[in-house]
Amino acid sequence: MGSKELLKEEDFLGSTEDRADFDQAMFPVMETFEINDPVPKKRNGGTFCMAVMAIHLILLTAGTALLLIQVLNLQEQLQMLEMCCGNGSLAIEDKPFFSLQWAPKTHLVPRAQGLQALQAQLSWVHTSQEQLRQQFNNLTQNPELFQIKGERGSPGPKGAPGAPGIPGLPGPAAEKGEKGAAGRDGTPGVQGPQGPPGSKGEAGLQGLTGAPGKQGATGAPGPRGEKGSKGDIGLTGPKGEHGTKGDKGDLGLPGNKGDMGMKGDTGPMGSPGAQGGKGDAGKPGLPGLAGSPGVKGDQGKPGVQGVPGPQGAPGLSGAKGEPGRTGLPGPAGPPGIAGNPGIAGVKGSKGDTGIQGQKGTKGESGVPGLVGRKGDTGSPGLAGPKGEPGRVGQKGDPGMKGSSGQQGQKGEKGQKGESFQRVRIMGGTNRGRAEVYYNNEWGTICDDDWDNNDATVFCRMLGYSRGRALSSYGGGSGNIWLDNVNCRGTENSLWDCSKNSWGNHNCVHNEDAGVECS
């Protein structure tokens, strides 16, 4: 409801401003009827002028009445505002509520100044009303309407300021406006004076125990101490106890390989079996259809045991057996009798430092250990050579004719083999150095007399329609097979063209010919 009433007030004020503009626009026209007109013009058709003026006066009267109604409405609204805001403060919007064409644009200000600004605007309304009345009186009392020149009137006295209007009714509560744009950052203030030092704070809680520090770097070595004097010779110690028996010695080297045994006697040869007659060879039948797998037949009777074949040659010697396990240690010997302590010698004088002795010789070998137990049986040796094959057995009966198999599907057509080309382009697919194949080697062509006809024949051998000669293409290596090639352009091969003999040239590889086929 509050927003609708505000819209009505704005429409009402807009219509007031429109009427004020209309009056302002009409007043310059009415200035032609002033008494002090220097050159009064005679009016013809007084009846027509009277009718026009009557209509104009009616319109002015209606406008004045409407303006009066608006003033009364504004007074009621002021009373309502005063009732809502007992302390004289008004909550208003940022845009002006009342503005006139003749009055300065006065915006409503918050709190105490709002009511004063509204009263000032009402006084402007009263002033404009009085001016309209004076203009109306001037029009009605203008002697020119009756073609009578009137005397110039004296200026009227200045009007007294109008009494303040009655406060209007309080208006509806204004809606909350949209959030304004963020203001610009203010200039930084001047740094204030330094405050007094604060009082000493209370002692903080004891912090957690820190992690143990890393180990420090090794310190520098201290100074080398002085060399001490040689100590006195010690007393001869008692004879030590008898040492324990030494460990078993290493396993001895393996013995030499034994002599090969004598070959055994050959066993008696078995009697040969009767040879069967050879059957007639049947005609090869057509490949039959793949038959279904037959039922598994009964197991045949075991055949008569054949005569044993001759005894095979003895097998190779078996692999070396694993070494036997280490024998148990022998029993410890009885301890030796302790020797009597020697007589203490006289303390000798301090001797000089002796020369470092030579390395002693290697001690004698220890007593060999007990013989170990017999080793485990070695793994069996490799299989002997295969015996001689037995004689061929009798030929079996011919089998039954198989059914013809289904005709196989026709195989796919194979890809066409690539034909060997005797010419090629090096350095690109259709542009590069021209090379020919002769005497099982690739070689280049000299560019002497090399022209487009020669290049066209060369490209025709590769399936192109025409070619363009490139002189001094270079970059080749090996043989230079052709020189002074002279084709007419209709040949199918360079072999048909006029040229020097193969390998006869006076060129270097900087003069190798090139082609560009299309």
From Swiss-Prot:
Biased composition annotated in UniProt, kind: Basic and acidic residues: 239-250, 410-421
Modification after translation, per record: N-glycosylated.
Glycosylation site positions: 87, 138
Positions of region (Disordered): 147-426
Domain spans labelled Collagen-like: 149-418
Keyword RNA-binding: no
Residues annotated as transmembrane: 49-69
Main location, first listed in the record: membrane
Keyword Amino-acid biosynthesis: no
Domain of life of the native organism: Eukaryota
Database matches in Pfam families: Collagen, SRCR
Low complexity composition bias: residue spans: 154-163, 293-314, 325-344
The protein's name in its UniProt record: Macrophage receptor MARCO
Gene, per the UniProt record: Marco
